[in-house]
Design a protein with these regions (language model features):
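Acidic/polar alpha-helix N-cap and adjacent early helical turns
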Residues: 205-215
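AMP-binding/adenylate-forming core of the ANL superfamily
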Residues: 42, 53-67, 85, 91-92
């Protein structure tokens, strides 16, 4: 069976990139593909400047299929359509061949010291633990580093997994600044009606009265 991967957002009103079967080789498999016919993409930095291939920033799109705007929300529309490009809120990069690689949502990125930490990478590692049903990774306040990594975990029924054993298990599986410094065990991760994980709900108890550098 030949598998074709596509990627799009509600705001793109359909698929915007495609990774056809013939490109399922080597590192290209980690990509969501290249923009489809009539679509364009680029990656921008903190000041909306264009970034070179391989550098992580915000993925932006342009094309005829993009939304006109958010209903009755002109300010929100203006914020995401700066410079006639749709700013997706996705962090990622484009390689020299024009393939797009998504790292995470920018608002979920953790700023720990001088490092940008992408929760999706950590979640993928933790999810491979046999005692973990599902997990989420968030940033919580830290006086020294600004933010540190916390894992929120749903473990299998009857599991004896502890915070200490999970942190030790992760020690040789990821860089030190990516490893969780603390773990919460809960019965169920919060989700909205469509099943989307609500990381803001997980972060809120730790950030009351404080301001994140990422929002």
């Amino acid at each position: 069976c030949k598998f074709c991967q596509i990627y799009g957002l509600t705001e793109t009103t359909g698929p915007f990139t495609c990774l056809p079967f013939e490109h399922h080789v080597d590192e290209k498999l980690l990509s969501c593909g290249r923009p489809m016919f009539g679509a364009r993409a680029k990656v921008t930095g903190a000041n909306d400047e264009d970034l070179p291939p391989g550098e992580i920033g915000e993925i932006c799109y342009r094309g005829e299929s993009l939304m006109v705007g958010y209903w009755a929300r002109p300010e929100a529309t203006a914020d995401v359509t700066r410079g006639d490009w749709f700013h997706s809120g996705d962090a990622g990069y484009m390689d020299k061949d024009g393939f797009i690689f998504i790292k995470d949502r920018i608002k979920d990125m953790i700023l720990s010291g001088s490092e940008n930490v992408y929760p999706a990478e950590i979640e993928a590692v933790l999810a491979s633990h046999p005692d973990i049903v599902e997990c989420a990774v968030i940033g919580i306040p830290d006086k020294k580093w600004g933010e540190t990594v916390k894992a929120v975990v749903v473990k299998r029924q009857g599991s004896t997994l502890t915070e200490a054993t999970l942190i030790e298990w992760a020690r040789d599986k990821m860089a030190g600044f990516k490893r969780p410094r603390s773990v919460d065990f809960i019965d169920k991760l919060p989700r909205n009606a469509s099943g989307k994980l609500l990381k803001r709900t997980l972060r809120e108890p730790y950030w009351q009265g404080l301001q994140r550098r990422v929002n």
